[in-house]
Amino acid sequence: MARHRNVRGYNYDEDFEDDDLYGQSVEDDYCISPSTAAQFIYSRRDNPEEEYGYEDLRESSNSLLNHQLSEIDQARLYSCLDHMREVLGDAVPDDILTEAILKHKFDVQKALSVVLEQDGVQPWKEKSERAVCAGQPSKGKSVISRSSQSESEIVPKVAKMTVSGKKQTMGFEVPGLTSEENGLSVRAPHKGPPGDDVSVASPNIPETGTPKSALPPPSLQTSEELGSTPTPVRKSGKLRQQIDVKAELEKRQGGKQLLNLVVIGHVDAGKSTLMGHMLYLLGNVNKRTMHKYEQESKKAGKASFAYAWVLDETGEERERGVTMDVGMTKFETTTKVITLMDAPGHKDFIPNMITGAAQADVAVLVVDASRGEFEAGFETGGQTREHGLLVRSLGVTQLAVAVNKMDQVNWQQERFQEITGKLGHFLKQAGFKESDVAFIPTSGLSGENLTARSQSSDLTTWYKGMCLLEQIDSFKPPQRSIDKPFRLCVSDVFKDQGSGFCVTGKIEAGYIQTGDRLLAMPPNETCTAKGITLHDEPVDWAAAGDHVNLTLVGMDIIKINVGCIFCGPKEPIKACTRFRARILVFNIEVPITKGFPVLLHYQTVSEPAVIKRLISVLNKSTGEVTKKKPKLLTKGQNALVELQTQRPVALELYKDFKELGRFMLRYGGSTVAAGVVTEIKE
């Protein structure tokens, strides 16, 4: 058969005829122009290998000994080095980068400019100096490192052990001590002029000079002979400069107070457009960017969405015209720094809205004043009612109602009063005080009554109140739980440039400093906070109420999920799968019974759960037990139940941490109950 003959008669020598050249991308036999080769072909011959001495490795590892840096500054220095390494690679040694960073006070951009401006950046290699062990000349090669007097004072050389006839003392500095062990000759320096040398002869480096027998024998000094020389002992562990967070917080609050604001409302009520236009009027968005959004939205056929694109940054949100995730930004008023969270209004993204509302202190409820639109959002099935109940159940007590799109009804006072009457009655039933609710007529597209009081005669004839920005500025910030143990709930996890990874979240209680050890629950893993970023600026500390980014090292990113809680290792949060809670049942169609499946929303956690027991029905006002072991729960009832989750969830009791003791229960796309944790089962 022909194919068999082809196989049997195959000449394999042709396959092994040519040698493989692994050092080049393309063999030299190919015809290629020099310009093309220089642009696309890599040649190892054009990049000669560099020889590095053993002393370079030792000196680069000890390059920071000449600088007295706190642990916080060291973390900042390492972070700056990581960023500079991504730009420069390994062409510049760490010593030069360190000097540039310290000279410019950790400003990476200035340090990079100085290093790049140097003519001809070449790989750095410091020439070693030759020294003779025990003060005698030697022809052999030895590795020598130079230490100055200041360096020896910062990190004293410590001998391993000094043996006397009576006792053993460890960790004392031994001036002039020379010891040999397995061919390693070490001479410890004593405090003297900067010319003193330390000779280290490694057994891995061959010696061709004076043999070991020609050197004088080592002399050991007892601890009694060294008693007259005071010697510092290096402590184990690093001393970190502690920051008085309470004092620093008072200084910060002496300027402007921090407030977390969430914007809620029915879908297409104009939430993103309203806040995007406000940010533009406040100067947080420049004219060039705004002009770009206007042109892009016109091309997409959505000219009215230009201001909404300030907060809706993803392509899918802009294409669909609805907010899907919580958009976060910052702006300032006269007396406050506001962290703005734009929550989605579509019912499919209620879990994301709960995540944003759980991190908020106050809220702005946006309603559409157009005929039929307000009624659609307010009636059964609309999100205006559900959002109002959710934020109140999650602890928000102050609310500003922005009656939006008033220009479409010609700023009619009758329409405004109709909306405020219906909505005010509902909010009072939901638990809001009348004094904590304010109604403001606005227009997000035209910008009327947002940052300044309207000058339109149609509005000023009957409305004399504050604009939306003034109302936000008048909100009272809540008391922060600074004295309680540290708690941070993770809302996002991502891999940043450099070492470690980053988590985003709001500090619910306590405070944190750079370099603190943290415990993640429920994974029960420890890590170290390498860096803290607040409002895109690196800081040394952060306290309760701050939305921060933490750069963490010492832990695998795969072990951290959204919903994990970071705490202090000494005061950890409890993780459990069974707990008891007091719940308030909302308007539901199907009664809640034993074994009822629900979706537990707790902070940023969304976990399937089952109601294991119906313990009792409670009185709404007094909390007294009115019925034990009920068969079912109907709408409006207050009850004590026991829930079980599929996976462990980190919880706190409501009486200890109000911020971390609230949760929501959803079933079939609607919220069925809100509750607080009363007991945690092990």
From Swiss-Prot:
Alphabetical UniProt keywords: Acetylation, Cytoplasm, Elongation factor, GTP-binding, Hydrolase, Nucleotide-binding, Phosphoprotein, Protein biosynthesis, Translation regulation
Knockout consequences: Embryonic lethality; embryos fail to develop after 8.5 dpc. Conditional deletion in the in the developing cerebellum and midbrain leads to severe development defects in the cerebellum characterized by the absence of multiple cell types. In contrast, conditional deletion in the adult cerebellum and midbrain does not cause defects in neuron survival. Defects are probably caused by ribosome pausing, due to inability to rescue stalled ribosomes.
Residues with the Phosphothreonine modification: T229
Bias-annotated ranges (Low complexity): 142-154
Region described as G5: spans on this chain: 443-445
Keyword Zinc in record: no
GO cellular component terms given for this protein: cytosolic ribosome; Dom34-Hbs1 complex
Chain segments carrying region G3: 342-345
One Pfam family named in its UniProt record: GTP_EFTU
Keyword Mitochondrion tagged: no
Region annotated G4, chain positions: 404-407
Region (Disordered): 128-154, 166-239
Domain (tr-type G): residue spans on this chain: 256-480
Compartment(s) where it occurs, according to its Swiss-Prot or TrEMBL record: Cytoplasm
CDD domains assigned: EF1_alpha, HBS1-like_II, HBS1_C_III
EC numbers on record: 3.6.5.-
Superkingdom of origin organism: Eukaryota
Protein family membership: Belongs to the TRAFAC class translation factor GTPase superfamily. Classic translation factor GTPase family.
Name listed for the protein in its UniProt record: HBS1-like protein
Natural source organism: Mus musculus
Lineage: Eukaryota, Metazoa, Chordata, Craniata, Vertebrata
Chain's gene name: Hbs1l
